[in-house]
């Protein structure tokens, strides 16, 4: 009995910690995509909305993506209608808005809940594992993910994507091979 208990205890602590690579999501076009496809990349995950005061951050996110994409950096944007109902459109509407208004070329995913009981499992992971942990406060909150899938930074909505704080954190992660 003691041997079984010790085995289970050791196995529990020896199990690898989950990472974003353990999740599958749907693209804005409805196709399944494993986040393990981004292994080895530095990833910025952002919850976005089309009718928010922070919506102009799409332009800054695109600049950020263009600046670092050739160095192994990607942005994954997840529309959500959870904050003030500021993303009421369909996935097709969102895609059209982002590409025509802001010229977005980084990856867009289907609209998902990012808080509450119906929160998408990816966001349940992000909000419980990031430092600080806790619910997202508003649209355009950002999670920086290392090349090995760990959360290494969390940036509030008001942090401009081209800010020194965020770009330095991205550059530090890109420098790690």
Regions found by a protein language model. Name each.
Residues 39-44:
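Local sequence-structure signature of Cys/Sec-based thiol-disulfide redox active-site neighborhoods
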Residues 4-13:
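Sec-dependent N-terminal signal peptides
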Residues 27, 47-51:
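Amphipathic alpha-helical repeat scaffolds
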Residues 54-120:
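Structural microenvironment flanking redox-active thiols in thiol-disulfide oxidoreductases
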Residues 13-36, 121:
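N-terminal "domain-start" segment that seeds a small globular fold
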Residues 121-177:
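Thiol-/selenol-based redox modules, centered on thioredoxin-like
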């Amino acid at each position: 009995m003691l041997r079984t208990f010790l085995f289970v205890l050791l196995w529990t602590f020896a199990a690898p910690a989950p990472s974003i690579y353990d999740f599958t999501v749907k693209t804005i076009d409805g196709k399944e995509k494993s986040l393990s496809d981004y292994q080895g990349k530095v990833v910025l995950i952002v919850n976005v909305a089309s009718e928010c005061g922070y919506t102009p951050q799409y332009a800054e996110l695109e600049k950020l993506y263009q600046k670092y994409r050739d160095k192994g950096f990607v942005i994954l944007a997840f529309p959500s209608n959870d904050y003030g109902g500021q993303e009421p459109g369909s996935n097709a509407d969102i895609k059209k808005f982002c590409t025509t208004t802001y010229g977005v070329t980084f990856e867009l995913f289907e609209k998902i809940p990012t808080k509450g009981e119906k929160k998408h499992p990816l966001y349940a992971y992000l909000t419980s594992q990031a430092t600080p942990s806790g619910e997202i406060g508003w649209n355009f909150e950002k999670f920086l993910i290392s090349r090995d899938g760990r959360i290494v930074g969390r940036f509030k909505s008001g942090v401009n994507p081209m800010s020194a704080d965020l770009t330095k954190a991205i550059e530090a992660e890109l420098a790690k091979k």
